[in-house]
Structure formats: structure tokens, C-alpha cells
UniProtKB/Swiss-Prot annotation:
Belongs to the UCMA family. GO terms for biological process: embryonic skeletal system development; negative regulation of osteoblast differentiation; negative regulation of SMAD protein signal transduction; osteoblast differentiation. PANTHER family: UNIQUE CARTILAGE MATRIX-ASSOCIATED PROTEIN. Predominantly expressed in resting chondrocytes. May be involved in the negative control of osteogenic differentiation of osteochondrogenic precursor cells in peripheral zones of fetal cartilage and at the cartilage-bone interface. GO terms for molecular function: BMP binding. Keywords: Coiled coil, Extracellular matrix, Secreted, Signal, Sulfation. It is found in: Secreted, Extracellular space, Extracellular matrix. Proteolytically cleaved by a furin-like convertase to generate a persistent C-terminal fragment found in almost the entire cartilage matrix, and affecting osteoblast differentiation. This is Unique cartilage matrix-associated protein. Residues 28-64 form a propeptide. Residues 1-26 form the signal peptide.
């Protein structure tokens, strides 16, 4: 029985030793993974800004300090571009409306001309010349 106890004791100690070694390697790998993640976080912080820094990036200048020449030029170019786009839009709208009104007037003139022509044909008695040639000149 003693040899069985010795074998069981050695197997048990081997299992305990292997489990400790396995935990140790997983811990060491885990710390290496953590170190890699921390390194990637540092790289991300170097590349990307914090959200608060990004929102205040263009507002670093104090309210009373004068704008730089570049800022003034950029703002003026943006304003001019917006004005140009607005002008083009309203010009296009005006042209479309003018075309619409012109077509409506042309159609109305055509309808009234046809109505006058029909009235003249209906009331022409054949005895007198038509209205165009029956003008009284003084």
C-alpha cells in the first residue's frame, strides 16, 4: 500500500505542479497581451484626439484675440461661395418662373386669338369685308 500511496502522491504533486505552471504561462501571456493592448492604446492616443480636444480645436484662440489672416481668408471664401450658390439658385428659380409665365401668356394669347377668329367667322355676313379691312380712316 505504501507504493500506491507514493504513486498517488507523486501523481497528485505532478498535477499540482503542471496546473501552477499552466497558470504561470497564462499569466505571463496575459501580461504580454495587456502590454500589447496598452501599446496600441498609446498609439491610438497619439493618432486620434480626445473628443473634447477635437471640438475645441478651432476655438483655441481667445475671444478677444484677433483672427489670423488665414482664418479671415477662409471665412471670406466660405461666405463668397455660399453667396454664389444662393445667387445661382435664385437665378435658376427666376428663370424657370419667367419661362412658365411666358408659356402661360403665349397660351392665353393663342386662346384669345382663336376665340376672336371664331367670333369673326361666326358673325361675318359675307356682305362687308372682314374687320381688318373695314377700318374707318379719317
Amino acid at each position: 500500500m505504501t507504493w500506491r500511496q507514493a504513486v498517488l502522491l507523486s501523481c497528485f504533486s505532478a498535477v499540482v505542479l503542471l496546473s501552477m505552471l499552466r497558470e504561470g504561462t497564462s499569466v505571463s501571456v496575459g501580461t504580454m497581451q495587456m502590454a500589447g493592448e496598452e501599446a496600441s492604446e498609446d498609439a491610438k492616443q497619439k493618432i486620434f484626439m480626445q473628443e473634447s480636444d477635437a471640438s475645441n480645436f478651432l476655438k483655441r484662440r481667445g475671444k478677444r484675440s484677433p483672427k489670423s489672416r488665414d482664418e479671415v481668408n477662409v471665412e471670406n471664401r466660405q461666405k463668397l461661395r455660399v453667396d454664389e450658390l444662393r445667387r445661382e439658385y435664385y437665378e435658376e428659380q427666376r428663370n424657370e418662373f419667367e419661362n412658365f409665365v411666358e408659356e402661360q401668356n403665349d397660351e392665353q394669347e393663342e386662346r384669345s386669338r382663336e376665340a376672336v377668329e371664331q367670333w369673326r367667322q361666326w358673325h361675318y355676313d359675307g356682305l362687308h369685308p372682314s374687320y381688318l379691312y373695314n377700318r374707318h380712316h379719317t
